[in-house]
Amino acid sequence: MSQHSGGLSRRRFLAGCAGALALAPLLGHGLRAEAAAPGRLRVAQYKGGDRLLLEAAGLADTPYPIDWAEFASGNLMVEAMNGGSLDLAYGSEIPPLFGFIKGARIRVVGVIKGDVNEQTVLVPKDSPIRLIADLKGKRVGYVRATTTQYYLTKMLAEVGLSFADIEAINLTVPDGAAAFRTGQLDAWAIYGYSVPLAQSNAGARVLKRANGYLSGNYLFFASPEAIADPPRHAAIADFFVRLQKAFAWRQANPERYAAALAAEIGVPVEAVLALLRNESQVRRLVPVDDAAIRSQQDVADTFLKAGVIERPVDVRPLWDGSFAAALAG
């Protein structure tokens, strides 16, 4: 497998991107490593994430304090939670799976049904690459242990290719943005607000979207300690109810939400509205159920077949249904 994932070769690669973008730290901004105070929640988010949404919807006045920490990817959230620095986070099905395989102390407690059209493979606007098959031998950036590794694996397999047929380069989101912007990548598998940013700032073109390759399940995961602690458990339940209401507000007020998000992430409002109009499904937060567990099991089985993981994994012990009552409301 032709992959770069660290060490001298990766440092040399990134040297060509130096100064292009300010690289974000690997761990969350505002992260607190000490034990949480009673009822206090330490919550991870992405840039322009749940904090902004709750504030825009007028639902941020929680009766418990929240320490927000910003991360670029779900795998970093898993690492921070396993280190005792977070109570609650969310990401795709993939980061909790890899964390679980490595013994991380996390449990999946809720499921966001969300958009997959903003999960993409990007290429430069004037690139001759028109099909996934054209990626053979090309430099393709991705983020290991995230959706990008999963849907890129499936897209390549569909045209008879694998990671061994491309020059796959594992990069953090900020590093990938710098590499793509400076022409160090032929393609970039990426997600979220990085897509409109790359389109706006680097003239990116969407080669292929991940609709049809991903379930659209994004998993809230919590630390076992937070789940077992009554004040934090109650705070998480209340947080979930507020977020359900905020998602409904977002659906009813796309222009107001787009204006707030565009100002936060630094892209034109119309770019955000285009993403919202193109969403693959209405965003909502639902309880853990058997279908969601089966979906993550399918992900694990796909990675096993592709040789990404070495042995079969039963994901059921990763899941916790103790917030079902709060989420069912």
What are these regions (language model features)?
Residues 79, 83, 133, 150-154, ...:
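Solvent-exposed, polar/charged alpha-helical surfaces in well-ordered, non-transmembrane soluble domains
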Residues 229-308:
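Secondary-structure end/capping motifs
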